[in-house]
């Protein structure tokens, strides 16, 4: 689990451990995340933009999940570097499956029109969204044996407090109908969707909405 210390990463680690998986939680500074070790994960330091680090940490694993983020670096540079290093490192480690936590602003509202393309889309969110868009292009253009999938939650703020319901919808590259409806989608249920796709893959080499 790369980016295990973030909001999505922490929930994914907890969900995977609860299901009986052995999980390696990769963060830049393990001392900041003792709760991950307390969950039962193997907490290690690593760098998702370094293919050698990825390969060494991923060896012996069946799958990888990336929920990495760096707010102190240009998003377009960081996400491209991470995508390239993850594909390279996981390929060398013979890890066949990678799930990536994307962003809902990449989903289409109509054919060829993404959320981030809409008039009035906030400038302060554009650079981060374009970073994820560049990441997706790296994945789509890669000649790789790694079977990747990018899951994009609704283009709204996810619920950090709500508990796990185990219920979600998934599929397609468009914003799910009523995705911003009465029941906010939670990080806990995003984690359920991620681990379900690790255990029972149903989508491959595409961007899909989840919510």
How would you name each of these model-derived features?
Residues 66, 70-99, 130-134, 138:
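NAD(P)-cofactor binding segment of oxidoreductase domains
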Residues 144-145, 158-166, 197-206:
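Glycine/proline-rich active-site loop of Rossmann-fold NAD(P)-dependent oxidoreductases
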Residues 137-159:
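Conserved beta-loop-beta element that borders a ligand/cofactor-binding pocket
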Residues 131, 183-195:
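Substrate-positioning beta->alpha
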Residues 1-21:
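N-terminal Rossmann NAD(P)H-binding glycine-rich loop of SDR-like oxidoreductase domains
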Residues 39-62:
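Conserved Rossmann-fold cofactor-binding substructure of NAD(P)-dependent oxidoreductases
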Residues 22-24, 30, 84-127, 141:
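Conserved Rossmann-fold NAD(P)-dependent oxidoreductase catalytic core, especially the SDR/UDP-sugar
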Residues 168-185:
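A conserved pocket-lining segment of Rossmann-fold NAD(P)-dependent short-chain dehydrogenase/reductase
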């Amino acid at each position: 689990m790369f980016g295990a210390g973030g909001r999505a990463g922490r929930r994914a680690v907890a969900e995977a451990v609860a299901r009986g998986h052995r999980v390696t939680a990769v963060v830049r500074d393990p001392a900041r995340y003792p709760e991950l070790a307390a969950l039962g994960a193997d907490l290690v330091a690593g760098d998702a933009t370094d293919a050698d680090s990825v390969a060494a940490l991923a060896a012996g694993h069946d799958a990888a999940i990336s929920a990495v983020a760096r707010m102190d670096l240009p998003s377009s540079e960081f996400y491209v570097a991470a995508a390239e290093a993850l594909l390279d490192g996981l390929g060398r480690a013979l890890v066949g499956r990678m799930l990536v936590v994307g962003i809902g602003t990449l989903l289409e509202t109509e054919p060829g029109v993404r959320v981030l393309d809409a008039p009035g889309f906030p400038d302060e969110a554009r650079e981060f969204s374009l970073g994820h868009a560049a990441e997706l292009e790296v994945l789509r253009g890669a000649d790789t044996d790694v079977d990747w999938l990018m899951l994009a939650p609704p283009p709204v703020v996810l619920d950090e407090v709500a508990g796990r319901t185990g219920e979600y919808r998934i599929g397609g590259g468009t914003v799910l109908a009523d995705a911003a409806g009465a029941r906010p989608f939670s990080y806990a249920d995003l984690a359920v969707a991620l681990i379900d796709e690790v255990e029972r893959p149903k989508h491959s080499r595409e961007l899909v909405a989840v919510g």
